[in-house]
Regions:
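Nucleotide-activated chemistry modules centered on ATP-dependent adenylation/adenylyltransferase
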Residues: 1-177
Length: 177
């Protein structure tokens, strides 16, 4: 598209609850990607590499296992960092599988999330993925999507594209708060 970057949207969000909210966000992501002619990958499953892929319910349970014991953590607490890592590791692995050198996340555009946590999780995910498959090196693009007017641009695009803007991060713990 621009700057010789061809984006690919990888949809993997087993943290989102309930399933209806997950479907709304997934369909909105797909609609937007299609309207822009961007490749969109639906990864309703989580694959550990050697094992068979899981469906949404199983992927949500696997995510839930990762955050067990962290249910009472506040927003921006340890639970969020574990959640970011879980999802960004899957993203790093998918990038390796597709031969993509860099990956980023829209999480970094949310004012509700800690940019430092997101960047730590992304770097750790790239490091683990590279240690497992050193011949397919990936790097995390730690871009601050909130500075230099990008937050305002995001808000304008939400309106322009009539894009669904969720009111909570997605997990049941943030929904309850």
């Amino acid at each position: 598209m621009a700057h010789q970057i061809t984006p690919v949207i990888y949809y993997f969000n087993p943290n989102i609850y309930p399933r209806e909210e997950y479907e709304i966000r997934k369909n909105e992501s797909k609609r937007h990607a299609e309207s822009l002619g961007i490749s969109w990958i639906d990864d309703d499953r989580f694959s550990t590499g050697a094992s068979m892929p899981f469906g949404y319910e199983e992927a949500h349970k696997a995510w839930h296992c990762d955050v067990t014991g962290l249910e009472n953590e506040p927003e921006r607490g340890k639970r969020c960092e574990v959640c970011f890592y879980h999802r960004l590791l899957a993203t790093a692995r998918k990038a390796q599988e597709l031969g993509i050198d860099w990956f980023a996340t829209t999480l970094a555009s949310s004012r509700w999330k800690s940019l430092e946590q997101i960047n730590r999780a992304g770097e750790a995910a790239a490091q683990l993925a590279n240690s497992k498959v050193p011949t397919a090196h990936v790097s995390f693009w730690a871009q601050n999507w909130r500075k230099d007017g990008l937050q305002e641009r995001r808000n304008a695009l939400l309106k322009e594209y009539n894009f669904y803007n969720q009111q909570y991060c997605g997990c049941e713990y943030s929904l309850l708060r």
